[in-house]
Amino acid sequence: MARWYRLGLMALILVMVWGCSTAQTLPEVNPVQPRFTKAGDGVITDHLTGLDWYVNPNPDQKFREAKAWAEGLTVAGGGWRLPTMAELKAIYQKDASAYHMDPLFQVKGAWVWSSELRNDWSVWGLAFYNNLQGWHSMDYGNGRVALAVRSRR
């Protein structure tokens, strides 16, 4: 019995010594960074996916106009394009706001264009207000908005 007592006491001492030395080497805790941050030039960085986003202020754009706007955007060095459906779905946030995305985006349209063509005359898009994926004629612009995206630089 004395042997078990000594073993238990030694184990307890080892745990206490090891625990104390480990506690002294733990890294300093940093405050939690928000998923999205917005720079002064309007670029929104998604720290989870590593993508940069930029919102087109015009809420009524046809697909070709939206695509030309994104590809011609020179903010923060250029390299912009329209997002894929997967990229759009990645920023959807069920409980974020009426539009179900971070308020930093301040999107004014009902539907957001993607870069994915359905056929020669229609394109896929996402309605953030109800998470509905659908396709629309390239020539329809009412309530359609563009977001530009690029890999973070």
Task: Set out the residue ranges of the language-model regions.
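Glycine-aromatic-enriched surface loops/turns that form tight recognition elements
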Residues: 2-81, 85-153
